Amino acid sequence: MRSTKVIHIVGCHAEGEVGDVIVGGVAPPPGETVWEQSRFIANDETLRNFVLNKPRGGVFRHVNLLVPPKDPRAQMGFIIMEPADTPPMSGSNSICVSTVLLDSGIIAMQEPVTHMVLEAPGGIIEVEAECRNGKAERISVRNVPSFADRLDAPLDVTGLGTIMVDTAYGGDSFVIVDAAQIGMKIEPGQARELAEIGVKITKAANEQLGFRHPERDWRHISFCQITEPVTREGDVLTGVNTVAIRPAKFDRSPTGTGCSARMAVLHAKGQMKAGERFIGKSVLGTEFHCRLDKVLELGGKPAISPIISGRAWVTGTSQLMLDPSDPFPHGYRLSDTWPRDE
């Protein structure tokens, strides 16, 4: 057996969404900050293509690279690689990374609660892990500041006509639309159609509405979040949502950044206040338990500090290798399993 590289991976999923973690075999990319390192990976694409493209990966998968932190407050940094993006932050991936760090012993576990500070490309996140019998059972993450951008904005979408949408940031940028507006329900049997429509809505939102983060160089809308109406019981709101991820797949989890963005919109519309909780439910019925912890400002914009909480499970370990005679050193994509990214 011969290989010019060996990458060590711990497999993991958070409430159904795959978020594998590279724990060895990759040197930290160049950059003075984790954000700059993530931009190198986004522009270079060599590593992302190797771990995500067939025959080693697939469109279903996200992969996280552990890197030494740049901020002295943090114990570890990580960079998220998605099929088409290298985002500032991800809720499900931060939960996977935290679980792998503790369950594998990379960071020492303290029972019943372990506190960590991690550095995502989008900023510092605080982690509280509930641990028992050597397992991180639930991860709570204080996400980066989140904010609503546009509320009730008209958007013209080919095949749908004019729909009303919100745009918001929850660690990544979203256009948010109610499922009823597009004549659909969030259920597994409509996953392909919803994902394709969601990507179409994202494209239209970038062309007609745009987005600009007040502090980061993030100038596009990444995802379409499709929602069903929120219900309230006391100080707890519950809502089903799903997120269409380019090129055209569904997030299997409730999407932590999406829940954060949705809470920011609910707060901006006067439907949620500090201290109240939000349960986000995925297309699979899994849940993230969230809280609008406090209200703040970000670059002069009203914002919130959200906390997201969920579970993750280690699924295995693997080693990715590259034989020097392999005709596909960067992998490949075919549209039967990897939708066209238009």
From Swiss-Prot:
Gene3D superfamilies: Diaminopimelate Epimerase, Chain A, domain 1 (3.10.310.10)
Catalysis: reaction(s): trans-4-hydroxy-L-proline = cis-4-hydroxy-D-proline
Domain of life: Bacteria
Signal peptide: none
Binding-site list for substrate: G91, S92, D251, G256, T257
Quaternary structure, from the entry: Homotetramer.
PANTHER family xrefs: BIFUNCTIONAL TRANS-3-HYDROXY-L-PROLINE DEHYDRATASE_2-EPIMERASE, TRANS-3-HYDROXY-L-PROLINE DEHYDRATASE
Protein name as it appears in the record: Protein BMEI1586
Species per Swiss-Prot/TrEMBL record: Brucella melitensis biotype 1 (strain ATCC 23456 / CCUG 17765 / NCTC 10094 / 16M)
